[in-house]
Amino acid sequence: MVQEACSPIGPALGDAAPGFGTDGIRGLAGTVLTPALCLQVGYWVGRVLQAEGPVLIGMDSRTSGSMVVAALTAGLTAAGRDVWTLGLCPTPAVPLLIRQLGVAGGLMVSASHNPPADNGIKVFGVDGAKLSASRQAQVEACLKGQTSMAEQGKFRCGVARPSADLLDRYREVLQESVAERRLDGVPIVLDLCWGSATACGADAFRALGADLTVLHGEPDGSRINVACGSTHLEPLQRAVIERGAAMGFAFDGDADRMLAVDGRGRIIDGDHVLFLWGSVLQEQQALPEQRLVATVMSNLGFERAWQQRGGTLERTPVGDQHVHAAMVASGAALGGEQSGHILSASHGLCGDGVLTAVQLATLCYAQGISLSDWLDRSFQAYPQKLVNVRVMDRARRKNWSACTALTDAIASAEQSMGENGRILVRASGTEPVLRVMVEAEQSDAVEHLTGHLAAVAEEHLNVA
């Protein structure tokens, strides 16, 4: 049944309305994320959320954030919801505050690691988890006018109020998470990416006594993620080495992920964080079934090294919501993604870059060793390369496996590697690219096969 009108916000957007991807609704602000779309998203999220009560909205530093928040607020209040706006904050602050305050849900306005011109909307339910697939589908159907909901009855307009002071609760949780551990005098560099981490990242480390150097430490929506942060580690590596720091941490735009470097500038990705933190929990007998949860992107060297420690690595599809679901189902204590999303059952089961950074730093010094020495105890990663092939046709990108030339090339490559490597090809859920990943024991094989498969994909998926 096609919906004729969505009073009080006007007609549905039809089939042109974008849907939820790997991490919410995301796209170019003003073109994909229009005020009209954000108004409708706010209204239908307000209707679809099951619990009664207010809804939280946080944002990163993007210039378009104020527009998106204003339109979402208009939609939510039109649905009768009170709205508490948090202002600039890390994404993990939203689910934490949902659970602490007992509100109906929350939204985070951010496009994470995407360029400044993009923006996005992440939606969380009453439990602080990302909105379920069935609820996302319900919102999408309402946006497109493919379904209808019962009338609300008498119109009630909600009230919006600024609530930036609530972020103090999140800051307190960061400090409480490390118990009595300290970082007094430890030289540390932070790359705050001009984004959400500027709201509390430096404060968290200073409160622990660290001797801090801060890069890109002010909110700047025109420079968020530009040649900095967790997707561009070179500035952090240079600063750590030049200043003789013990370690450094870089965050993405909304601070839900983190990558680290040691005092020698070596990169510590999410796989290494899981291995090192997981080893501590294993020794403390605080890791049920010796299980870690990661995604299909995690390195084969990580998996085999963890198995040698008697552990089990459970793999999920890409996306921290899949890691979250697997951890809940299995009772796992720790999980995450190679990209730096780390979820701890003891700390709210939400990817939190700042919390992960303070945990890694304080756990390291609680053992009386440097991060470099600790990294030496980690696994030896297999050479791995990821190439993004731009494919603008969404149908071809999503259904890439129908391309015989590409699947034949993959099969041939897999046969040549045997059990000593892996190939993963998938359509990105956040960008118009096909991701081609190859890992093997020999780096020359990785380079050759990645280049070959990317060329095949480029040739056969971008035909006129």
From Swiss-Prot:
The processes (GO biological process) annotated in the record are: carbohydrate metabolic process; peptidoglycan biosynthetic process; UDP-N-acetylglucosamine biosynthetic process
Alphabetized InterPro entries for the sequence: A-D-PHexomutase_a/b/a-I, A-D-PHexomutase_a/b/a-I/II/III, A-D-PHexomutase_a/b/a-II, A-D-PHexomutase_a/b/a-III, A-D-PHexomutase_C, A-D-PHexomutase_C_sf, A-D-PHexomutase_CS, Alpha-D-phosphohexomutase_SF
Species: Synechococcus sp. (strain CC9605)
User: What high-level taxonomic lineage is stated for the organism?
Assistant: Bacteria, Bacillati, Cyanobacteriota, Cyanophyceae, Synechococcales
Q: What is this protein called?
A: Phosphoglucosamine mutase
Q: Which reaction does it catalyse?
A: alpha-D-glucosamine 1-phosphate = D-glucosamine 6-phosphate
List GO terms (cellular component aspect).
Answer: cytosol
Q: Which GO terms describe its molecular function?
A: magnesium ion binding; phosphoglucosamine mutase activity; phosphomannomutase activity
Which NCBIfam families does this UniProt record tie to the protein?
glmM
